[in-house]
Amino acid sequence: CTQISVAGATSTNDTVVALASGKAGNSKIADEPSSAAKLLQRALTALCQGLCKMIAWDGEGANVLMEVIVEGADSREDARKIARSISSSSLAKSAIFGQDPNWGRIACAAGYAGPKFDVNSLDIALGETKLMEKGQPLPFDAEAATGGGAGRAS
């Protein structure tokens, strides 16, 4: 599930649409889980994820891209709610923008998202740098966690 938030809002200006008319006369690949369907799914997913990042980077004044990945949630909807809560949190966004690897702001936003989760299984990372594992803070290199000033955190 890929979604973007540019300045906390979504508009038709931030939309990507893929359509198929069927006019080529090819067989429908949605009718069966064929290798062609799987290949198309992977290609469209990669394309859309790339376009989402380009749209976000193209936002007025954008100089930081925050990518939130939630794994292990009870459902896709729970994962979506947690990711949206983190990506919409003014405190989490301020920390990322200010290159402050404040895991507490991320954990807080996940906590008030609504879905229940076990804090003792919470892992938080910025890029490849783990900040928290199984609910326990870890020692980390702040510069590595913030990309060394590169302006990108995931």
Feature annotation, model-predicted:
Residues C1-S154:
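A structural signal for small-residue-enriched, beta-sheet-centric alpha/beta enzyme cores
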